[in-house]
Regions:
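Basic/polar N-terminal segments that are highly enriched at the extreme N-terminus
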Residues: 1, 21-24
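Sec-dependent N-terminal signal peptides
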Residues: 4-15
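Sec/Tat signal peptide C-region and signal peptidase I cleavage site
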Residues: 16-20
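An acidic, Gly/Ser/Thr/Pro-rich helix-cap/linker signature
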Residues: 23-96, 102-105
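Acidic/His-rich structured neighborhood in mature extracellular/periplasmic domains
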Residues: 37, 77-216, 220
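Intrinsically disordered or highly flexible coil/loop and linker segments, enriched in small
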Residues: 43, 110, 224-228
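Solvent-exposed loop/turn segments at secondary-structure junctions
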Residues: 54-56, 122-126, 236-238
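Flexible, glycine-rich surface segments
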Residues: 165, 169-290
Length: 290
């Protein structure tokens, strides 16, 4: 019994020391990061104001190492995010914002069904936008070594947006990864695609008008075409070379014209309604949904 108590006592102090070291090193990192921020034309006044209270958040590192998108199979991931309760909440949101939703669909030519689905997945129609201090989250991930450069750039962009009075830093609470608002925009997405749709001289992504229109603007700018073909289920022949099979949509390799891939598809005539010149890629589904 004494050995067990001793073991946990040592473990407790060991973890405490690790956390203390991280906090000390984090404060040193902030001093160095300030020089980089100033070199990127962020005012010292803004930096000192918004970064003074940023803290190293140990939980952010834990969340970064375990993300459900990477560990849950497709069936589990989808079922958690497509409940009847969520569906009804989406219907309520549409009924309460019908005029805005229809205006945005017509202006940006993005299907309302797509936008509503994305909003449901990201924040359950604005009911859960996250409670993490985004500045501390981004600073923690910038200090961390795993994806430091990516999050450093995001933090610098966010500081610049604050410096230019485009965003109120006091409202910056969201996801552990630094995403913000009803559609969970990262700072670079805010910079490049967020818009002041209600023309109040302020971009508020926790406001339905700005958030919904910004999401539509983002999809339009990255090339989404309304009612254009996206995914179709096919059955492949056994002789297709494995190099043409993608296991993820994140990085599609070997894109070819549809006419090329038809030779490997059973019943290719079922795809005749699509233009043969379309560039396509093949994605294999997870084993759990085959």
């Amino acid at each position: 019994m004494k050995k067990i108590k001793f073991f946990f006592l040592i473990l407790f102090f060991f973890n405490s020391n690790v956390l203390a070291d991280n906090n000390n090193d984090f404060e040193k990192w902030k001093i160095d990061f300030k020089q980089r921020a100033l070199a990127n034309n962020i005012s010292e006044k803004t930096f000192d104001l918004v970064m003074a209270d940023t803290k190293f958040l140990e939980n952010v590192i834990k969340y970064d190492r375990y993300q459900p998108e990477f560990y849950e199979d497709t069936k589990t991931y989808v079922s958690k995010r497509s409940s009847t309760k969520k569906l009804n909440k989406g219907i309520d949101f549409y009924q309460n914002n019908k005029d805005l939703i229809n205006i945005v669909e017509n202006k940006f030519e993005i299907e309302k069904e797509l936008l509503l689905s994305l909003m449901g997945i990201e924040t359950n129609y604005g009911t859960y936008v996250g409670k993490m201090d985004i500045l501390s989250s981004l600073a923690t991930l910038s200090y961390d070594k795993r994806r430091s450069e990516f999050f450093t750039k995001e933090l610098l962009i966010l500081l610049k947006l604050i410096d230019e009075n485009q965003i109120d830093y006091k409202s910056l609470y969201g996801s552990w990864a630094g995403a913000f608002g009803f559609f969970q925009f990262m700072p670079s997405t805010i910079k490049n695609h967020a818009i002041d749709f209600n023309t109040d001289n302020y971009i508020d992504l926790k406001n339905s008008h700005d958030a919904y229109a910004s999401a539509a603007n983002y999809l339009k700018k990255i090339g989404w075409k309304k009612n254009a073909p996206c995914f179709y289920r096919i059955t492949l022949k056994d002789d297709i070379p494995k190099k043409y099979l993608n296991v993820s949509a994140k990085k599609l390799l070997n894109k070819k014209k549809l006419s090329f891939f038809k030779q490997y598809v059973q019943n290719p005539d079922k795809l005749d309604f699509l233009k043969s010149s379309y560039k396509v890629a093949i994605i294999t589904p997870d084993k759990d949904i085959i």
